[in-house]
Amino acid sequence: MKSQLLSLAVAVSTISQGVVGQEPFGWPFKPMVTQDDLQNKIKLKDIMAGVEKLQSFSDAHPEKNRVFGGNGHKDTVEWIYNELKATGYYNVKKQEQVHLWSHAEAALSANGKDLKASAMSYSPPANKIMAELVVAKNNGCNATDYPENTQGKIVLIQRGVCSFGEKSSQAGDAKAIGAVVYNNVPGSLAGTLGGLDKRHVPTAGLSQEDGKNLASLVASGKVDVTMNVVSLFENRTTWNVIAETKGGDHNNVVMLGAHSDSVDAGPGINDNGSGSIGIMTVAKALTNFKLNNAVRFAWWTAEEFGLLGSTFYVDSLDDRELHKVKLYLNFDMIGSPNFANQIYDGDGSAYNMTGPAGSAEIEYLFEKFFDDQGLPHQPTAFTGRSDYSAFIKRNVPAGGLFTGAEVVKTPEQVKLFGGEAGVAYDKNYHGKGDTVANINKGAIFLNTRAIAYSVAEYARSLKGFPTRPKTGKRAVNPQYAKMPGGGCGHHTVFM
């Protein structure tokens, strides 16, 4: 007994002096993390308290949102930072950056009939321009897609294959004075041009139904369009929050993230307060355990304006530092009211878009989580249009979960997941109604447990996980530019 007490005293003394790496106080006496134990620490009351806190940050300011650089988002960043710092378990930092904020509104009419349009962020302004409408072939991604008489006209373009910014640029190169992009799936269309570009023309988004109707009208006669776009621009200082466990192997980092900002229209509690609080809840639960591999949590800023925060972070890492990140997990909208359990298609089997080596294994891990509980799931297109984009471009394996946005649920999906057919996964997507009341408690609880399941697995061991290649390409078939699922973090950001 005496020798055991002496050993204990030496261990405590050594830890208190900070000799054992960066490990937090009490680390040797914590149990090793397991999937079951970490999942059991996840409580719905903690999750809901978190999303209610984010709602309060939005409610506290006249803007009623948490858009990057605004007061609601500043409160969000400070709270996340302070909550993690207080655990003593993490090294926490705020990564400062400056990005251009843009807010735009559009009004559109065709042959005197008003249409419901959304201006693309970073669109050039348009002061009630009036012109004949022409239709681009294919998806408007190439110069040959534009009619010879495009000059001086407004051009109608179908969504898909290339980014909104590229479509706007191609329209500008063809001498169009405006562009209208319509959806290739049911529902309205909102998005961003990704930044300012002198090639861009005033650009608005339109629903699939309205876009098809306009194309039919052009085919049978002349259509005159009036377009008005009001755009505001402002440089804003903002921050990512990065928290890495003090313990664990820092040369084998398991990384996961969620964007912490909202759109201008509302508080963004599902998009993406759900993902932000999901990983926050897991981060707090993880403090009860020790682990073998370091875990790094990230809350990204300015995702809604073109993945700006995550791109800034990845660009700040040289190859040596990024190689320490063995995989990246992304969680964007995990509490949709009319949800479906969707897993990024890392192996490309559903959409012919593969992630870097290891992405398939991440997909299989999440499939196992649902399968073990007898729960249905489906793939969602792994297009690289969320905060994992910058990671896969540098060959970091990636994956994650998503419960749906503006795309409507089918009768077949209702048989799997319940809910209501013909209604969007999240009817309040990118709207003022995206509040705490918009959250499906069952979905957010289940998906947060899935986050815990994956973190525990990889924090314990990366044995058998594929070695990352030095170079790699993701196979992309343009026919799959039409994506089910939709939403922030999938295909509305750019395409």
Swiss-Prot record:
Transmembrane segments: none annotated. Zn(2+) 1 binds at H259, D271, D332. GO terms for biological process: proteolysis. Its cofactor is Zn(2+). SUPFAM superfamilies: PA domain, Zn-dependent exopeptidases. Pfam families: PA, Peptidase_M28. It comes from the Eukaryota. It is found in: Secreted. Residues 1-21 form the signal peptide. The active site is at E303 (proton acceptor). Glycans are attached at N142, N235, N272, N352. Belongs to the peptidase M28 family. M28A subfamily. This is Leucine aminopeptidase 2. It comes from Trichophyton equinum (Horse ringworm fungus). The lineage of its organism: Eukaryota, Fungi, Dikarya, Ascomycota, Pezizomycotina. The gene is LAP2.
